[in-house]
């Protein structure tokens, strides 16, 4: 998986950088979690301040285009981004906690 930055804009009003990128890959389409980790390492950004907005994969091509936003602090990210974007666009703890909350408990599953 190779990521190329296509555009980078500083948005001072919202305290963030807006990044446009393209990914070339072989094999299976990379997951959002993989893209998030690689993009965070490439931009030297903390993972809790980076959110992936969108990923677009065209049928039959091994290329993805997308956009991401890097905030100056995690507080700004939480104030500005809607909750569903934060859950979908961030890898790590928030994603794991959402899965744990949605999963039925063992007692409820046994009662059925």
UniProtKB/Swiss-Prot annotation:
Domain of life: Archaea
Region Disordered, residue ranges: 88-112
GO CC entries: ribonucleoprotein complex; ribosome
GO molecular function annotations of the record: structural constituent of ribosome
Cross-referenced SUPFAM superfamilies: Ribosomal proteins S24e, L23 and L15e
Biological-process GO terms, alphabetical: translation
Signal sequence range: none
Keyword Isomerase: no
Statement: the UniProt record of this protein carries the keyword Lipid biosynthesis: no
UniProt entry keywords in alphabetical sequence: Ribonucleoprotein, Ribosomal protein
InterPro entries referenced in this protein's UniProt entry, alphabetically: Nucleotide-bd_a/b_plait_sf, Ribosomal_eS24, Ribosomal_uL23/eL15/eS24_sf
Family in the record: Belongs to the eukaryotic ribosomal protein eS24 family.
Name of the featured protein: Small ribosomal subunit protein eS24
């Amino acid at each position: 998986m190779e990521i190329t930055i296509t555009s980078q804009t500083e948005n001072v009003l919202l305290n963030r950088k807006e990044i446009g990128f393209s990914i070339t890959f072989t094999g299976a389409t990379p997951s959002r979690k993989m893209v998030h980790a690689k993009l965070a390492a490439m931009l030297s950004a903390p993972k809790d301040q980076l959110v992936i907005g969108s990923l677009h994969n065209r049928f039959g091509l091994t290329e993805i285009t997308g956009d991401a936003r890097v905030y100056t602090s995690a507080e700004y990210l939480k104030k500005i981004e809607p909750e569903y974007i934060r859950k979908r666009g961030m890898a790590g703890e928030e994603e794991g906690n959402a899965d744990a909350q949605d999963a039925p408990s063992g007692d409820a599953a046994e009662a059925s």
